């Protein structure tokens, strides 16, 4: 832990209000992005005379994305509210761990939907899966839009996770290297 404050440390504290503002802005931006992702996905359905009705709940990747989007929106709202309360702001490790978890969940749901979209768009002929987007074009377009919004949400949480990691680890000094040990080697 730091035992003294020097000029460089006070320079770091000068940027903390801007960092807090950027962090809060990203959290608040993630909320409408997550809500829009959920809305587009949940209301997405298309009927095809040959294959029948296709809804989001027919595909587990889309259900997972809706679940993670709901978690992202709720967590972003809770974390933004908690960042205004002084007793929670000092708990950098809580934000660090929870931001990491949410970012990892977001990237897993992006990957799952991206794989599902790739298979729906291109098919897998070696496995005898035909592409489905020619039959369900509107459905695929809305999935693509939801995937783009969810990817932007992930990017917000990725930057938030980097900021919270900086906050959690910036209270520690870098490792001390003894100059005698360096000269002796």
UniProtKB/Swiss-Prot annotation:
The family this protein is said to belong to: Belongs to the Casparian strip membrane proteins (CASP) family.
Secretion signal, residue range per the UniProt entry: none
Subcellular location: Cell membrane
Topology of this chain in the membrane: Multi-pass membrane protein
Extracellular side: 37-64, 114-145
Transmembrane region(s): 16-36, 65-85, 93-113, 146-166
Binding partners and assembly: Homodimer and heterodimers.
Keywords, ordered alphabetically: Cell membrane, Glycoprotein, Membrane, Transmembrane, Transmembrane helix
A Pfam family matched in the record: CASP_dom
Glycosylation sites: 48, 58
Protein name: CASP-like protein 2D1
Keyword set includes Secreted: no
Cited InterPro entries: CASP/CASPL (IPR006459), CASP_dom (IPR006702)
GO CC terms in record: plasma membrane
Cytoplasmic side: 1-15, 86-92, 167-185
